[in-house]
């Protein structure tokens, strides 16, 4: 049986309802003084009412706990106009003719825009003039808010760093990571795809109706979304975060050079802390792992954009000392606009160099840094690239270009706006992880596209090429299976054009 299905097989336990005591209002937070809202609990439930009330107040709306003469807008869910008017009569409340009786879709749209929207049309359950009349209008169903056509492929969606659905995507990424630790790729991809599509949405999901028409949301994913909407968190995510195996794998894999196999081995041996692993004399470590432990504190801390820019200057100075015409491009998350990362990636290519000069460049750069005392660790992997070899069928395949995985010493004085607080214990430098990739000039567009990411964007780009265009794409090239030829490209824009896709800027590839 599918492990994901078993995880959601039983009915979810409902949490205790929150009382109205938690629904206090602070006048100084009210941005829209002319509007006074009352959210009807009937057919909605107290938990959801509390959630919407708190959300509206955070957005600057005044929401009353009890109905009063000051209320200007009454919001209801799954109620017709006559239902609301009947409720008002039962409560012996005489509604003003100016009272707006609105479907919850109005409030949701207000939350998305961050300000009040037009009340007329689809949101209105009762016309203003009917509010004081007898409740005889027929039921008026409000259709779900239309979700524009969203592609299942990340390469057809524009995903910036402005994520409106962190509460859901963070949960999905934790679950995906847990399945990756268990080497269950299928389940991991399910949650990664769901996280990817929610990151592209220009609005926050507030109700399950908002998920209608959105691709990549399987039933097990929607179950998590529903629980977070109702309870504010996922019990399954909470269980994962408290799971000893997950905590151990998360800790072990934070060490440079430690993968799943080593983590599994250490966990089975009973290790739960890095200090115990470091001090155990029976364990042997690879050269990469020894470097990972030695510089652990620096490597586990995030690399800032200022530090990345300083490393960029360092790399360009070294490369240009040997190949003055070389192009050095920062790739990865920093090219996509991120402010922090775990390492800094660079793509190097030279239009005027010979094959021998390309092969020797990284060796010369390493020797230069070693002489300057900047090279703390180096693992150079020689190129196995073959020009006539077809692109890989695997969506996660690594490329065959020459590359170097490094740890460099970055002096604080080279960093613009360097915080003095980081210079603790008299230490004047920080160890930074750096990846250098050397590629042939004619393949630079494909390599740049692949190394820019994100991981899910690249996966979907390759899936799209295979399933929709009968092509094969990887970091080396693009093969047309119908014409049986390699398609040339001088830029990323040309690759998108070959695939029949609108060009997407790096800052919109944060899938």
UniProtKB/Swiss-Prot annotation:
Modified residues (Phosphoserine): 134
Position of sequence motif Nuclear localization signal: 11-17
Transferase as UniProt keyword: yes
Binding positions for a 2'-deoxyribonucleoside 5'-triphosphate per the UniProt entry: 333-338, 342-345, 450-451
One matching Pfam family: DNA_pol_B_thumb
Positions that bind Mg(2+): 343, 345, 435
Name listed for the protein in its UniProt record: DNA nucleotidylexotransferase
